[in-house]
């Protein structure tokens, strides 16, 4: 068995789950090897690593983290210089709601062909219930002046929803939500972790997180 050298993150640039994992790794200043995956042509090395065959997937020396929130928690347990984990327990309830009801409604709005029995307009209304809740909480972030793991976990999905129909989204009376999202999209952290890299192939020179995002 080859000697373990460095944690390896399998990722896909636009995937909101992968985005939030990369954000946490960036904030934690964790140096991992990053491998961009083409989802329609998954390498066998990735499938051998990831039990679910989904991104993100982080290979550690003794285990594999196959859930984005687990990757976030692991990274911030190693190093949390901006206290992202410092938030009320309710923050994890919001993440669960985002990953549950909101994501289901988002998918049925964004991908109507995949869900022919779902009405995209009604699905958008269902998703909006969660966004209204966030609108009433934000000040300017979910728990005050400082970002938390909840902000980083939820924002990529709000971004994905907004991009379904940006004209409609920006017409809504979501003053706090729109400011929150726009600030996120304009942040150096977000733009760093959205840097494009080529698809990983066996034999490639390792692309390190520190070289790509932490410089």
Regions found by a protein language model. Name each.
Residues 136-145, 189-194:
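Surface-exposed helix-capping loop/turn segments at secondary-structure junctions
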Residues 144-167:
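GST superfamily/GST-like fold recognition
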Residues 81-84, 168-172:
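Structural helix-adjacent loops and short alpha-helical linkers that scaffold large soluble proteins
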Residues 29-31, 116, 161-169:
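Short helix-capping/linker segments at secondary-structure and domain boundaries
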Residues 171-199:
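A contiguous, mid-protein "functional segment" used to position or interact
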Residues 197-215:
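Acidic/histidine-enriched, glycine/proline-rich intrinsically disordered or flexible terminal extensions
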Residues 1-142:
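GST-like domain detector, emphasizing the conserved glutathione-binding G-site
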Residues 84, 132-135, 155-163, 185:
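Catalytic cores of nucleotide-enabled group-transfer and carboxylate-activating enzymes in metabolic
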């Amino acid at each position: 068995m080859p000697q373990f050298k460095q944690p390896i993150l399998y990722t896909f640039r636009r995937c909101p789950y992968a985005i939030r994992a990369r954000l946490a790794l960036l904030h934690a200043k964790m140096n991992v090897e990053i491998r961009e995956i083409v989802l329609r042509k998954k390498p066998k090395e990735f499938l051998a690593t990831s039990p679910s065959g989904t991104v993100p997937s982080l290979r550690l020396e003794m285990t594999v983290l196959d859930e984005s929130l687990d990757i976030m928690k692991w990274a911030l347990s190693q190093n949390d210089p901006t206290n992202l984990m410092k938030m009320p327990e309710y923050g994890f309830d919001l993440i669960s709601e985002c990953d549950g009801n909101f994501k289901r409604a988002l998918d049925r709005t964004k991908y109507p062909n995949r869900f022919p029995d779902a009405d995209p307009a009604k699905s958008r209304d269902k998703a909006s219930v969660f966004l209204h809740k966030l609108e009433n909480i934000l000040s300017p972030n979910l728990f005050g002046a400082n970002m938390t793991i909840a902000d980083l976990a939820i924002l990529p999905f709000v971004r994905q929803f907004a991009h379904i129909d940006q004209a409609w989204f920006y017409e809504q009376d979501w003053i706090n939500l729109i400011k929150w999202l726009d600030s996120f999209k304009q942040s150096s952290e977000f733009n760093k972790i959205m840097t494009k890299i080529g698809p990983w192939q066996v034999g490639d020179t390792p692309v390190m997180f520190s070289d790509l995002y932490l410089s």
